[in-house]
Design a protein with these regions (language model features):
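N-terminal cap/leader regions of alpha/beta-hydrolase-fold enzymes
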Residues: 1-243
Length: 243
């Protein structure tokens, strides 16, 4: 599928958020996907995944997650990049992540070329996607190996109480893990699922891939698993488009 790509700036209460808008050629309208990256922001690897998702017929809206401290920066997949990404997270409060999300969803709600709104996220972005599911405008959410849900750790806040708010999830939820992910061990995976069911969530889908490492969908580096990536994306597309 032919795609078009452009930069869009979204005004938030205390900053401007640079986003990449990737959509099929044509006038639309399309279902939109709010697409949260990992700590490295909008790298070419991340954008390749976003483009691949757009090729299924979605308009993908990918924001920088650290607009206050790392605007315009795509970090390298090395130790320095990891340190910078963790510092960007540590400098951002849950309230700031949430206010950015509201601004992004407000922007999508105001577009005439958008129908349904979905959300996906990876790593810390998976945690942010889970919080996006608190907004009733998000029809379905897919969290890929989300970090920090089990202890509430996201950004500057030691406990964002994200799982404690599981009852606030209004749409359908799919969560993807790998069994070899040290950031989300078996007990943490069970805690996420148990919290959703205990909160009364009925539309929950869980995928746990044997042998999957953390960030197995990142298409560079030794942890990448192309087969699991294909399976995960196909499952996510099916889940989002299912009624």
């Amino acid at each position: 599928m032919k795609l078009r790509e452009e930069e869009v700036r979204v005004a938030a209460p205390d900053c401007e958020i640079r986003t990449i808008w990737i959509r099929p050629v044509g006038d639309g309208p399309w279902p939109a996907v709010l697409f949260y990256s990992d700590i490295f922001q909008l790298t070419e690897s991340t954008l390749r995944t976003a483009r691949r998702l757009a090729s299924y017929g979605f308009a993908v809206f990918a924001p920088e997650i650290y607009p206050r401290t790392l605007a315009g920066v795509a970090l390298e997949f090395d130790d320095a990049g990891k340190v910078a990404g963790m510092a960007g997270a540590a400098a951002t409060t849950t309230a700031q992540f949430d206010s950015d999300r509201v601004a992004l969803l407000d922007h999508l709600a105001g577009r005439a070329d958008v129908t349904d709104v979905f959300c996906v996220g990876f790593c810390i972005g998976g945690h942010l996607a889970f919080r996006a599911a608190f907004d009733e405008r998000v029809s379905a959410t897919v969290c890929f190996y989300p970090t920090g849900l089990q202890d509430g750790q996201v950004g500057a806040d030691a406990d964002s109480r994200t799982l404690a708010r599981a009852a606030d999830v209004t749409g359908r939820m799919m969560v993807v893990f790998g069994t070899n992910d040290p950031h989300v061990p078996a007990a943490a995976r069970l805690q996420v699922l148990t919290s959703l069911y205990a909160a009364g969530s009925e539309h929950v889908e869980l995928h746990v891939y044997a042998g999957g490492e953390h960030a197995f969908m990142r298409d560079i580096g030794p942890r990448h698993d192309p087969d699991l990536t294909d399976a995960s994306l196909a499952a996510a597309v099916s889940f989002m488009t299912r009624r």
